[in-house]
């Protein structure tokens, strides 16, 4: 839904671009064809491999994982924070709030109806889209939107980006943009 799947798709598209423009570097690839479906399969494999690797790394480093809803329960007498995870009581001196993210759905007329009808997509749906669209309008010029725009444009989709701020990638360093 984010960085790793997007980077995987961008890498696939970059390989396709190398095949198409290889003559610039003395390489000719006859009949280069891009399969968005194959790129999606590779993306899923990369994500699964990364998840397995992270799980193995956490286990090797002694990280305990509790599959449960976590709730803050105040402070213990020791000054540490109390956390309930299912039927377990845990303590920690610091808490990282890392609950994942969801796409922000702005109050733009027609967006909710478009989501329900399936023609408006968040980053979650677009990363699972089996057929690349002929045209795509990306509302939002943030990092994820721009990565999606670049990916789809590089595989032949006509892309338009609409950004309300004075520049795209607004959260980046002004010296970069």
Regions found by a protein language model. Name each.
Residues 1-132, 165-169, 174-177:
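Glycine-rich flavin
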Residues 130-172:
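Rossmann-like NAD(P)H-binding beta-loop-alpha module
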